[in-house]
Amino acid sequence: MSNKISVITVVYNDVKHIRETMESFFSQTWEEKEYIVIDGGSTDGTAEVIKEYADRLAYWCSEKDAGVYDAMNKGVQHASGDWVNILNCGDYYFSDHSLADAIRNCDAGNADIIYGDSMKLRQ
C-alpha cells in the first residue's frame, strides 16, 4: 500500500477562513497527497477564493448539497488516496509536518484509522 492521503474540505459561506485552511494543506511536507474541496454553493465569495487554487486541486465543486455529510461523501467519491482526512473549513494543521507525522507514526500495514489530538484556539 502506498500512503497517499486524500484531504477533503467541505465549506459553505466561510470566505473568512477558507484561504487559511487551504494554505494549511498546501504547506504540508508530505508529498503523497491530494486536495478535494466541496463547496455547498456559497454566495459570500468562498468559491472565488477556491478558484484561485483550482490548478492545485484534485477536484472541487461549488453546488448545493444536502448538508455537511452529503458534502463529505461527495468528496470521498472523488478521493483516490489510501487514507482520507477531513480538514474542515476554519481548521488547520498544527504544523507543516502533521500529515507526515501521522503516516510515519503508524503501522500503515495494520492501521485502519489514524487519529490525533486537536486544540481549540478560538471560540
Enumerate the predicted regions with their spans.
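Nucleotide-sugar donor-binding/catalytic module of glycosyltransferases
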Residues: M1-Q123
